[in-house]
Design a protein with these regions (language model features):
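General helical structural elements
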Residues: 7-9, 14, 30, 192
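Bacterial N-terminal signal peptides that target proteins for export
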Residues: 14-38
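Sec/Tat signal peptide C-region and signal peptidase I cleavage site
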Residues: 42-49
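Flexible, surface-exposed loop/linker segments and immediately adjacent secondary-structure boundaries
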Residues: 50-198
Length: 198
């Protein structure tokens, strides 16, 4: 918690002084709240982006999405306000996993000899791949995975069942129930891709 104190002067007890001190106190409160929110990484809205790391560069688009380009030819497009964290599981200095807690990501991971499996981890699912383009949407207690191109394996973190998706396939992963692969209707695909500026 950030504490602040405004000096007690004679000016502070006049009507103009009280108004000025009230404005100053509000400004300090807003600044303190901004610092506190920023330090916990609670980012949302089209103008705010997650910091790029692990050698990735970041750019905001006109649609409010954020595009990360990583040195290993991995591209990640994040929906405006998406909450995610890039990870380097094998500690080689390159991103090989993303933890997604809210909203959607579109990922393109080219197939490369010797590359470790790339994962997107949400509270409900792990989507693993070795060369494809796919989207993952974490919303509340459900994670949806859709494959644009290639193949993606989807499983629950606890290992209770898994499925493999091909191009045009999707699956909704909820806390219980079977993982059912479905061909997504064009309207659903279009709506998800629009959120990702595609």
């Amino acid at each position: 918690m950030i504490r602040y104190r405004i000096a007690n002067t004679r000016f502070a007890h006049t009507p103009k002084g009280k108004a000025a001190m009230t404005i100053l106190a509000r400004a300090v409160s807003i600044a303190a709240a901004s610092i506190t929110v920023g330090s916990f990484g609670l980012l949302a809205g089209p103008a705010l982006a997650q910091p790029a790391k692990l050698g990735c560069t970041s750019a905001l688009t006109a649609q409010g999405t954020q595009t990360l380009h990583c040195p290993t030819a991995i591209t990640i497009v994040a929906e405006s306000g998406a909450k995610f964290e890039l990870r380097d599981r094998n500690r080689d200095g390159h991103v090989d996993s993303v933890e997604l807690s809210n909203k959607a990501l579109l990922l393109e991971v080219p197939k490369k000899q010797g590359r470790t499996r790339f994962d997107v981890v949400t509270p409900q699912a792990i989507a693993a791949v070795r060369g494809t383009k796919w989207a993952v949407d974490a919303e509340g207690a459900k994670t949806s995975v859709f494959v644009v191109d290639g193949r993606v394996s989807v499983a629950r973190p606890a290992g209770r069942g898994s499925v493999v998706l091909g191009a045009g396939d999707g699956v909704d992963v909820e806390p219980s129930g079977d993982l059912i692969v479905k061909r997504w209707p064009p309207a659903r695909v279009t709506a998800l891709m629009a959120r990702l500026g595609q």
